[in-house]
Amino acid sequence: VIAVIVILLSRNNPSSVAKRYVQAFYTDDKTATSLWAFDFNAIRLSEYDGSEEEFFEAMSDEYSADISSWNDFYKAVDSSFQEQLEDEYGEYKVTTEVTRTKDISVKKALEDCAVWVKILERDINFDTDSISDACVVTAKAKITGEDEIERTKIDVYVVKIGGSWGVLDYISAD
């Protein structure tokens, strides 16, 4: 029981959330989506008046796939992104590491992410008052391909809402 609690606590901290998000960004859209501090699929649906049916139809066209569920959508996104990465790098591997975690005020997080926060407030009624803590986590992603290596540094803004940490926004730090 104690081991389970330790594992759960170590996965629900800003560094872990940011690292898992950056890794999932390249490899697993379902996981990346689950790590946002808000309902990211609601943002996706906001352009379609909340209609999953219209969204899935549009995504079926965009990805040339039969998409009728979120799992179908995640698979199509992952497949498309993997194909793009393979075209650019050949066989590749993605690794991530956290290089810095800095506590910041909620006010600073909201200021730094102001454009995105306004969209969230407008489109999904995101309540910034529910944020109780904030950090900015710098993570490095490395794509090692057959012929080249690409490195990217990303500042991930992670906020605490209702006891859980989630991604508010990310900004390239290169």
Model-inferred region functions:
Residues F25, T128, V158:
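Short, exposed beta-strand/loop patches in secreted or surface proteins that constitute
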Residues D147-D174:
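Short beta-strand edge/turn micro-motifs at domain boundaries
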Residues S51-E148:
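Surface-exposed, charged secondary-structure patches
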Residues P14-A18, V137, V167:
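Hydrophobic aliphatic residue packing
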Residues N13, T33, K153:
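Amphipathic alpha-helical recognition patches that constitute DNA-binding helices
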Residues V1-T27, D39-A58:
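Short, low-complexity N-terminal intrinsically disordered segments enriched in polar/charged residues
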Residues D29-W36:
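Solenoid-repeat scaffolds in large eukaryotic assemblies
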